[in-house]
């Protein structure tokens, strides 16, 4: 407590992104939330000033016992920094001589509720030996509740974080009845005192409160850093990061959504160049986001709300207006939010994961829609992802004509490796094979058409700049092709057409078969094939119009 009392008394310091404050973590117990806080050996953590600190503190200062509001719900999307703001609030309230009962982690609270709360109470009454003795004598939660009830002459400030851990849908491994009991105990304990609760926006209780007029104040914290906060984050951490130009910084801001929790992974990477750091960042964010995101959608896919969900996801992906008739349970509030009647995703990785999910579900109509195609106009760093999805979805729906061959897609399948590709030899059947991983190194897709004893195989690469692109033809013929060729009957006529889809039509080129001599045998480098360069307009005129 001595360290807390030495903190800056100026509340504006906590709202100023130029300030990096070293704060003592305001919970004395052993089980601190080290998954969310980097706490050093002296018990301190760093807090970059956040503008929303002022909003939260101002709201708390409006509390009035008996004649006004006494409860505040703080909720929001994943990784905003709610927990750091609340811990800083706890420090400031302590510093201004208010008694704070700070409970930072309801997951840990549920393991041993009595000891966990007693630790918080010890700090609240650090300067009152008589009260410390009373707290020490509490043997169960009823004793704690009675103690708090008896403190009617002095208002306590209860700050309870991570309340989603007590939600019935949160998999904490704690019995549902125990969760309900803890919720009841917390409510009784904080009754007649000031009560600040925080949770992710997906919490069932929060979803109820968000859409009801209740007797509590509410603060929503969506997204990540604003422009000024992001600028100061770069200034503070530039020495610890690989060198980046402005475009690469914009790319990083897009993929992370400027979310503090996600930006933290960039600091962990320890990579010396941007490409490796970005790859690590993508890997870590995918691990954190993809499973919970798709699990939520999978549950809805089995209900009668699936079409609502798909339409709503399309609105989120394209930052459009929400559809009429949607409900609070039709989308995942951790990753998506609606503000001023407009739909938003929290970060680019969420957008990409949801786009890939709906793409694999066959909802190609989303990606040929002009609202999707126009997306990259406001965000050039994602134009490759947007246009690739639009091109491939357009081919799925309308086909493509190249080298006088019409590829009208009958079926599409997703592949992780060449082993997943099994060519159909049914007459006039065209199958479109699509890689599960976006930005697959060799190709973006592969068409296979069997017609009049000929198997037409057409690998596809989508790019804005063919000249600056890696040699996908060489990569395909050295990587995937040797694995595909043994699956093709020897007596079958094969025609290979490598399709480049880019800004403008180019000149078709007939490429002859090449070999390299290896000891006593010749090894094929590539078969005879045709290299075709076709413009976006031949796939979808809207793509060409908005590029």
Give residue spans per PLM region.
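Conserved NTP-binding/hydrolysis module of P-loop NTPases
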Residues: 109-135
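Conserved P-loop NTPase "ATPase switch" module shared by AAA+ and STAND
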Residues: 127-179, 194, 463-468
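C-terminal leucine-rich, beta-strand-based interaction scaffolds used for sensing/assembly
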Residues: 1-20, 29-34, 84-86, 100, ...
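Sensor-1/coupling segment of RecA-like P-loop NTPase cores
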Residues: 160, 164-212, 218-222
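Walker A/P-loop nucleotide-binding motif
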Residues: 66-92
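N-terminal pre-P-loop "Q-motif" helix
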Residues: 25-32, 39-63
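Conserved small helical "lid"/interfacial subdomain of P-loop NTPases
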Residues: 209-258, 266
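Catalytic cores of nucleic-acid endonucleases
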Residues: 440, 458-540
């Amino acid at each position: 407590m001595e360290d807390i009392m030495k903190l800056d008394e100026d509340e504006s310091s906590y709202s100023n992104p130029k300030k990096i404050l070293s704060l003592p973590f305001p919970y004395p117990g052993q089980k601190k939330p080290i998954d969310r806080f980097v706490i050093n050996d002296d018990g301190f953590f760093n807090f970059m000033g956040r503008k929303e600190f002022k909003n939260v503190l101002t709201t708390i200062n409006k509390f009035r016992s008996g004649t006004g509001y006494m409860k505040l719900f703080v909720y929001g999307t994943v990784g905003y920094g709610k927990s750091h703001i609340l811990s800083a609030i706890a420090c400031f309230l302590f510093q201004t001589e208010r008694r704070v009962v700070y409970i930072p982690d309801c997951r840990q609270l549920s393991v041993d509720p009595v000891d966990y709360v007693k630790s918080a109470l010890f700090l609240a009454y650090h300067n009152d030996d008589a009260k410390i003795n009373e707290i020490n004598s509490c043997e169960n939660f009823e004793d704690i509740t009675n103690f708090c009830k008896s403190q009617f002459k002095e208002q306590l400030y209860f700050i309870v974080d991570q309340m989603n851990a007590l939600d019935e849908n949160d998999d904490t491994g704690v019995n549902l009845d125990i969760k309900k009991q803890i919720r009841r105990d917390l409510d009784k304990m904080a009754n007649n005192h000031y009560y600040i609760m925080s949770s992710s926006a997906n919490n069932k209780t929060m979803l109820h409160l968000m859409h009801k007029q209740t007797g509590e104040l509410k603060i929503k914290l969506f997204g990540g850093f604003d422009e000024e906060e992001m600028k100061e984050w770069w200034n503070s951490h530039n020495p610890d990061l690989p060198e980046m130009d402005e475009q690469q910084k914009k790319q990083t801001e897009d993929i992370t959504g400027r979310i503090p929790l996600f930006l933290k992974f960039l600091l962990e990477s320890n990579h010396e160049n941007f490409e490796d750091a970005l790859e690590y960042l993508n890997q870590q964010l995918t691990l954190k986001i993809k499973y919970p995101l798709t699990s939520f959608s999978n549950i809805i896919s089995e209900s009668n709300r699936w079409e609502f969900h798909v339409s709503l996801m399309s609105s989120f992906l394209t930052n459009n207006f929400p559809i009429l008739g949607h409900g609070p349970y039709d989308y995942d509030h951790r990753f998506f939010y609606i503000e001023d009647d407009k739909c938003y995703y929290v970060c680019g990785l969420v957008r990409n994961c949801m786009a890939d999910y709906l793409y694999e579900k066959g909802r190609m109509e989303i990606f040929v829609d002009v609202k999707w195609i126009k997306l990259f106009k406001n965000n050039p760093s994602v134009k490759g992802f947007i246009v690739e999805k639009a091109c491939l979805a357009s081919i799925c729906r309308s086909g493509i004509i190249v080298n006088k061959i019409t590829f009208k897609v009958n079926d599409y399948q997703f592949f992780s490796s060449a082993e997943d590709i099994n060519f159909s030899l049914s007459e006039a059947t065209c199958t479109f094979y699509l890689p599960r991983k976006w930005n697959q190194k060799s190709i973006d897709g592969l068409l296979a058409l069997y017609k009049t004893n000929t198997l037409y195989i057409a690998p596809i690469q989508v790019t804005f700049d063919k000249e600056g692109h890696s040699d996908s033809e060489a990569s395909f013929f050295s990587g995937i092709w040797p694995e595909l060729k043994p699956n093709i009957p020897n007596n079958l006529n094969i025609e290979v057409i490598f399709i480049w889809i880019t800004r403008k039509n180019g000149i078709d080129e007939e490429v002859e078969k090449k070999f390299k001599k290896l000891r006593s045998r010749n090894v094929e480098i590539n078969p005879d094939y045709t290299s075709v360069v076709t413009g976006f307009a031949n796939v979808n005129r809207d793509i060409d119009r908005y590029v």
